[in-house]
Every structure is written in C-alpha cells, then in structure tokens.
Amino acid sequence: MLVHTYSAMERPDGLGAAAGGTRLSSLPQAAYGPAPPLCHTPAASATADYHPPYFPPPYPQAPLPYGQGPDATAAFPHLAADPYGGLAPLAQPQPPQAAWAAPRAAARAHDEPPGLLAPPARALGLDPRRDYAAAVPRLLHSLADGAHGLADAPLGLPGLAEPPGLEELQAIDDPGMSLLDQSVIKKVPIPSKAGSLSTLALSKDSLVGGISNPSEVFCSVPGRLSLLSSTSKYKVTVGEVQRRLSPPECLNASLLGGVLRRAKSKNGGRCLRERLEKIGLNLPAGRRKAANVTLLTSLVEGEAVHLARDFGYVCETEFPAKAAAEYLCRQHADPGELHSRKSMLLAAKQICKEFADLMAQDRSPLGNSRPALILEPGVQSCLTHFSLITHGFGGPAICAALTAFQNYLLESLKGLEKMFLSGAGGGHGESKASEKDTKHRK
C-alpha cells in the first residue's frame, strides 16, 4: 500500500501556506458577493429599540454579601479578572455598541438609584435587569412578616416605590379578601400616598365600595298591577338595584332585566352588566339566584309599598269584622260557654296585642332609609330578611292583617256583652211572671 505524503511546500499549485492569503486576495471580486456581516446591524430607525444580548457569567456566581467600597477588589481577588474576557473577540465586530454605550450608561446612572442590587451589578460589570418592576409583587408576598420593619428604610429597587398596578395585584392575591368576593359592590383600591412598604400592606379597610349615590335614580319602571287607564311609573334607585343583587334574593341578569322591564335581546345581559359597572355594581355572568321566584319578585319596592298601603286601607275599612263576630257568637250561644268563651277572647286579644306591638317596633330598611334599631339584632335581622324578600310589603301587610283580627276580637267581646245583658234581662222577667202566677193562684 502506497502512502503519498505532501508537505506544504510540495503542493501542486506551487503555493505555500504563507501564500494562501495572497491567493485569496488575488481572486476576482466579481465572482463573489460581499461577505455577510458577522452580527446583526440594526437599521437606523430601530437603533433606539435594540438592546444587545445578555450573556450570563461563565460560572455560577453566588450573591455577594458586601457593598460597594474601595477595598472590594482586595478582599475578593477573583473579581479582578473580567469574567467576560473570553467573549471580547465577539464584541469586536459590533461597532453599533460603541454608540449605544454612552446613552445607556447615562440612562442607567439616572434611573438606577443606589440600593441592594446595584453594587453587585457594577462590581461584575453586568447590565442591571430591567424586569425588577415585574418581580416586585412576588417579592412583596414574601415580606408578609418583615414589611413593617423595612417600611422606614426605602429600598433602592427600581419601580418599588410605586409599581404600576400593584394595588390591583394585592387586592386579587390577598387571601384575606376572599370573604368580600360575594359582594356586588365593585371594589376600588385606595391610591397609596407614600412609597413605603407599609402603605402596600392591604387590608379590608383599604377597599371601599365604588357604588355611586344610592339615592340616584337608575331607571323608571311601569307598574305591574296598575290599570292601563292609570299607568304609574316607579323610580328605581341605585340602592334598590344593589339590594336586589344582594342576599337574600341575589338576582341574576335575566331576572333583574325582567324586574326592570328590559326587553330581551341578544346582548341584553352584557349591556346590563356594563351599565351596572358604570355605577359601581358587579353582576358576574352565569350567576344563580338564591331565593325562589314569587309574584312579589316582579314588584319593585315602590309598587310593593304602594300595594301594602292599599291593602292596609282595605283591611281597616272594608273587612267585615262585625259580621264575622256576630256569626261566630251565634254558633256558641250556650249560656254555659259564655264565660269560658269570654276568657278565651280576652287571652287572644292580649296575645294579638303583644305581636302587634312587636311588629310595630320593626325597623327594617324601607327604601334608602336606615331607622334606628329598637329590637334586638337577632330578631331584627330576621324581620329585615322578610322585608327584603317581600320588598317592603310583608311587614305592613301583617300589621294590616293584625288590625283586622283585633277588630274581630273587639266585635266578639261586644257580642258576648250583649248576650250577657239579654240573658240577665230574660231571667228577671221570668221571675216576675212566676210571682204573678203565685199571687193569682192564692
């Protein structure tokens, strides 16, 4: 087997290794286009938006527990060598970096305050990361216990003083706010006036209801029970809409649209939610109602109160209490039962009076009024629940029914008194007749 070995001086073309560069340079330039650049050269319009690539250090570097000082190099000799020395040739063919160095250094000196992360960055010759503002919410969640201790010394992190949107992140991520999620009032964070961490600690008191004036008229609704010849409209306030969306009813968009007499449309629910958001009320999509739908659900508070007032007037003036009392008295006209029946009527009158007095002390909110409480909170809360379910109709209606029942008891007692008088008069006449008979016989 023959092995041919050629040295550099025995090449067929007669050119040595030293003449290689001369031969390449002597080739005609027309046959070859210009060589592509070794790096990307941005256009002049994109120069301001271009940032050079970030190269991590060639070895893992632990956080340095020291500050910037004159003896930093002597105390830490491994920092004397440039960790990016091996990457220097790569930066040579990039002339645009020289033009960007001065503006970036000036911007860094202007925007970066001296703080915790600045000395290690300067000591290593690294460019500071620009996403500190995005990392601030994660940093603050880890400072739940030490936030008050760091409040007096502001940190030098860029964007930590007033990070944009931090209040909203805290309001969403704070686990202590889970109890307020079911509220229909749209929560608005209070803007912080100071840049310390103590103002960033969010609590329940820092969320206020964004609801507008509760007495403001939201819309006007025609009555359900009025005749066509005398149609009356009732004003629905913002406070009433809030009460219909809150417990115990918790109406959804469909039922609320029916109460407000809104015509059904394809985007009716979305339009209603957008309008409620403008006044500070939150109506989530897909919400389920909490209470059963009754005929009273379709009434607004103004019409329900109007119905209760008319019902009370009719019960007081038109209820046949006297006729009912006389009829029942004739059913129990046995003289042996009169005394026991009178005792039962007096006891029923006393019980009815006690219950009527209790209902008279009811201070359930009527409309936007908030009267002072008289009853105990446990009893008043139950009466308020009943009033909210009936939209103000239930309490006055029960009082009107109690008034009609009391009138019946009074008429029954009057009927018994007449029966007692007639019975006594009849007995006295019979005794006189018997005396006359005895005298006549004698």
From Swiss-Prot:
It is found in: Nucleus. Its main location: nucleus. GO terms for molecular function: DNA binding; DNA-binding transcription activator activity, RNA polymerase II-specific; identical protein binding; RNA polymerase II cis-regulatory region sequence-specific DNA binding. GO terms for cellular component: nucleus. A motif (PPxY motif) lies at residues 54-59. The modification Phosphoserine is found at residue 246. One of its GO terms (biological process) is positive regulation of transcription by RNA polymerase II. It comes from the Eukaryota. Keywords: Activator, DNA-binding, Nucleus, Phosphoprotein, Transcription, Transcription regulation. Disulfide bonds: none annotated. InterPro entries: TF_AP2, TF_AP2_C. Pfam families: TF_AP-2. Residues 287-417 are annotated as: H-S-H (helix-span-helix), dimerization. Expressed most prominently in the mitral cell layer of the developing olfactory bulb and to a lesser extent in the granule cell layer. Also expressed in skin, articular cartilage, primary chondrocytes, and chondrosarcoma cell line SW1353. PANTHER family: TRANSCRIPTION FACTOR AP-2, TRANSCRIPTION FACTOR AP-2-EPSILON. Sequence-specific DNA-binding protein that interacts with inducible viral and cellular enhancer elements to regulate transcription of selected genes. AP-2 factors bind to the consensus sequence 5'-GCCNNNGGC-3' and activate genes involved in a large spectrum of important biological functions including proper eye, face, body wall, limb and neural tube development. They also suppress a number of genes including MCAM/MUC18, C/EBP alpha and MYC. AP-2-epsilon may play a role in the development of the CNS and in cartilage differentiation. Belongs to the AP-2 family. Binds DNA as a dimer. Can form homodimers or heterodimers with other AP-2 family members. This is Transcription factor AP-2-epsilon.
